[in-house]
Design a protein with these regions (language model features):
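Mid-domain alpha/beta scaffold segments of enzyme catalytic cores
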Residues: 1-196
Length: 196
């Protein structure tokens, strides 16, 4: 059985010293990896890493908390160019994050541009949402092309929100917090979700 980790940041500064060890272990486990971009630079790094290994793929995107003064049209143009790499299989990590102080207007604008990119390139989307489930849901509902083409990574809300996103055809990703001893509510969401 192959394992696919759909959300990695192996190129992050913290993991660079362990880079070779991680890649070796993944290879031994027959694991495929999606190295997820969250800035232009990390998207470029993801593509470079993917080019070195047949089991690594890349996504390109601007995380909602990664505010930049660069014009949105320029960001779009650069992301579009990056998305043409044959190892790019998704757009992400994109979404809304109201925990950090990134301007909401920027977050909505860059989210819309990146959804346009995903649609034009027929790529699935990796979403990041934090303290913005209602706003994100209302914004995303009209984007029908996302049905069965989107994952909401590190899901951390309740069964009601899980049901809402599953009804849109989204996949939900669960990360480390589901293992925390006091996080029974999130484990309840996990048991509610379909196995695939």
């Amino acid at each position: 059985m192959n394992i696919i980790d759909t959300h990695c940041h192996i190129c992050s500064e913290k993991l660079l010293p362990l880079h070779e060890e991680i890649l070796k272990e993944c290879s031994e486990l027959n694991m495929e990896i999606i190295e997820v971009g969250y800035t232009l630079e990390s998207s470029e790094s993801a593509i470079r890493l993917a080019a070195t290994n047949k089991d690594i793929y890349a996504s390109v995107g601007i995380h909602p908390s990664e505010y930049t003064a660069e014009k949105p049209e320029e960001l779009y143009s650069r992301l579009y160019s990056l998305s043409l790499s044959p190892k790019v299989i998704a757009v992400g990590e994109i979404g809304l994050d109201f925990y950090w102080q990134s301007p909401k207007s920027f977050q909505y604008q860059i989210l819309e541009l990146q959804l346009d990119l995903a649609k034009k390139r027929s790529l699935p989307v990796i979403f990041h949402v934090r303290q913005a489930y209602h706003e994100f849901y209302e914004f995303i509902k009209p984007y029908n092309f996302l049905s069965e083409n989107a994952v909401l990574h590190c899901f951390s809300s309740d069964v009601s929100w899980a049901r809402s996103f599953l009804n849109l055809g989204f996949y939900l990703g669960f990360d480390g917090p589901v293992t925390y001893p006091k996080n029974d509510a999130l484990r309840q969401v996990l048991t509610f979700c379909p196995h695939e």
